[in-house]
Amino acid sequence: MESKLRVGIAGPVGSGKTAIIQRLCENLKDRLEIAVVTNDIYTQEDAKFLTNSKALAPERIKGVETGGCPHTAIREDCSINRIAVEELEHEFTTLDLVFVESGGDNLAASFSPELVDVCIYIIDVAAGDKIPRKGGPGITRSDLLVINKIDLAEMVGASLKIMERDTLLMRKNLPWCFTNTKTGEGIKIIAEFLCNQIPFARKMV
């Protein structure tokens, strides 16, 4: 039986994808049945991080070693990830939500519609306030754009006002939010967004 929603999490290396998945699992695991597939090129570091954080039971986390371009494994030939998702769905037949975390990639990364239903793209403030206006599919067309690590803005000389202005310009009416995984700011917004994507899921109270 398929899960109700497959969610792709993409973004550059170091943008905070795994930390956001951890926070989302902590926020939603008492309300939804969740599993995670992580992608790394040669290791399973992200899967180990989630396991060690106890965000989910270890058997609900599957690490995939892509052995090559991270973009290929989520777009052109997503079979390795599709198999991993299907294995989790076979083992846990009441899944509401499966996260598929891509390996770190550039602003051109996008998921195959055969693999996920919804794409969340994550960038971080530490990369500079110019990132939103650089565009790319993740910035302009993802179902939700997340601008993470807002606590670092002052330290790196980035303006959140500029990032907000450019994000509104690039995304028009598509949703986006700021987050800080250290404090949890913005995580509830993402969690609510995901719950609203699941037609028959147990809604947040």
Swiss-Prot record:
<dbReference type="GO" id="GO:0005737">
    <property type="term" value="C:cytoplasm"/>
</dbReference>
<dbReference type="GO" id="GO:0016151">
    <property type="term" value="F:nickel cation binding"/>
</dbReference>
<comment type="subunit">
    <text>Homodimer. UreD, UreF and UreG form a complex that acts as a GTP-hydrolysis-dependent molecular chaperone, activating the urease apoprotein by helping to assemble the nickel containing metallocenter of UreC. The UreE protein probably delivers the nickel.</text>
</comment>
<keyword id="KW-0996">Nickel insertion</keyword>
<dbReference type="InterPro" id="IPR027417">
    <property type="entry name" value="P-loop_NTPase"/>
</dbReference>
<dbReference type="GO" id="GO:0043419">
    <property type="term" value="P:urea catabolic process"/>
</dbReference>
<feature type="binding site">
    <location>
        <begin position="11"/>
        <end position="18"/>
    </location>
    <ligand>
        <name>GTP</name>
    </ligand>
</feature>
<comment type="similarity">
    <text>Belongs to the SIMIBI class G3E GTPase family. UreG subfamily.</text>
</comment>
<keyword id="KW-0547">Nucleotide-binding</keyword>
<comment type="function">
    <text>Facilitates the functional incorporation of the urease nickel metallocenter. This process requires GTP hydrolysis, probably effectuated by UreG.</text>
</comment>
<dbReference type="GO" id="GO:0005525">
    <property type="term" value="F:GTP binding"/>
</dbReference>
<keyword id="KW-0963">Cytoplasm</keyword>
<keyword id="KW-0143">Chaperone</keyword>
<dbReference type="GO" id="GO:0003924">
    <property type="term" value="F:GTPase activity"/>
</dbReference>
<dbReference type="Pfam" id="PF02492">
    <property type="entry name" value="cobW"/>
</dbReference>
<dbReference type="InterPro" id="IPR003495">
    <property type="entry name" value="CobW/HypB/UreG_nucleotide-bd"/>
</dbReference>
<protein>
    <recommendedName>
        <fullName>Urease accessory protein UreG</fullName>
    </recommendedName>
</protein>
<dbReference type="InterPro" id="IPR004400">
    <property type="entry name" value="UreG"/>
</dbReference>
<keyword id="KW-0342">GTP-binding</keyword>
